[in-house]
């Protein structure tokens, strides 16, 4: 028998990385929020790798921070090693990665949730979504507790009817031995959502005391220590070392000899696996000519002996895991503390969602995280933040926050999922962002913090800090307009940097465009130049070195911006439009894109179809441009 237990503005189902950001955004925007969690000991659980960030994922964390989210601050407080990746490549792909103490990370996030004034955290299972008159009205929990609300955000991760596989054994449970959610899938089906089965996995954890690190390569953290949050000051702490080792022919022999015992290859698992984080057995089958695969050995925290074997995700039987691991250099006597496993779970087709991550057919229902078909903590947190903001704006009857592909990686993520969908766990990559030179991790605050300010997630103090940084950059750019004569001192400096000499006066800004010249070099020449913070100096140098490419991308955005501004009504009758191909009519009717730009990215919709749509819209004489009050992000320009 159900019993009524309270009314909330917004209810968040799940307290993983998506649920945490969604609940905090909702509460901080003034909405009375309830966050339901299957187990309070699993808040922000790092069930797989003990790390935040990485290639493209670090960009997402910086954007979450710039909009007022929590992940970056939590990673900065709980890291045990920080490394900037891809420094040998261009600035667009520089990505920060933190090895974190996963238990401290969980506790830190739980404390933040518990301390938020408008937020109630409760251990219970959301089992049913209540819909009345076509709108969200509340939820019912598995024990019969009923809550009313105006919006629900589903962030259940990999827990919906999850199934763990280790060799021939299959167990109905969630990650790390936690309980799974059994009822919500049925409720989602009744609401009309198409559910699929996806699969991911995790490697074994081994005891630090059983490893011989002298046979492995050391991987040290960066000094000075970088940070994710734009609020974090300079950090000084002793960092832990990670290690690198490799598989070998014997490792491969043992795994391949037991391939039929892997549920992925025995036919036991039919769910779609992740392409970009394959199991070790999948790697050996897909890349048979590769002699070895690298493995990173990573500590899971400061107060545990558990070491994470990155690159060795597996669902092989326990005995095969033990035998194959002991063939690795330094692992001859290794002891497994937790076995690797595969997990399959229910997820929705994300093309049922709008760019806000709200359901197209049910106002007030939002989805975020792995339930949407994505993979990764950072992708989940980014979706959680976006869904939380838009749920709060929905409850307030305010325009939504729509991040475009030219605004943020979060915009690319939302657009890819809602427009293209995915047939396998979706992972963010820099190659997915066509404007990645503009969407660098270093300028996330300059791109997004003013948007966060408008949603109410950015404090006065933080906004003032951003304004000071902008003025610092502007003052430096004005100073770089000055011209210096071709003195001996200048040419000696250029020679020392392997740059050609000058014979006439030259602008300081022009000098800075040279590959080997940095702002500190110019300070030596012109002591009157304003000194800059590291963050401002980085912006000045990147703008100088990549200025031509940046302008080309901005011009590309300006050319295509018109399509993004042309709205398509949600009830637009595509079937009645003569000239649209049958496939285009079917795809557009099913997807109901928000604008012409989104329509153009749907598989099966051709440029000719877009031209037909543009003509039809003009004939209808409808207002096709975003107005100032139709999207929070509209007057934001890069």
What are these regions (language model features)?
Residues 4-18:
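Beta1/beta-strand and adjacent pyrophosphate-binding region of the FAD-binding site
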Residues 7, 24-128, 143, 155-172, ...:
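Conserved N-terminal/central alpha/beta ligand/cofactor-binding core
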Residues 39-41, 185-322, 330, 410, ...:
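An anion/pyrophosphate-binding glycine-rich loop and adjacent beta-alpha core
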Residues 130-146:
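Conserved beta-strand-loop-beta-strand element in the redox core of flavoprotein oxidoreductases
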Residues 13, 146-157:
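Short hydrophobic core segments
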Residues 432, 449-611, 615-631, 636-638:
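Extended, charge-enriched "interface" segments that sit outside catalytic cores
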Residues 308-374, 402-415, 533-587, 592:
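A glycine-rich dinucleotide-binding beta-alpha-beta segment and adjacent secondary-structure elements
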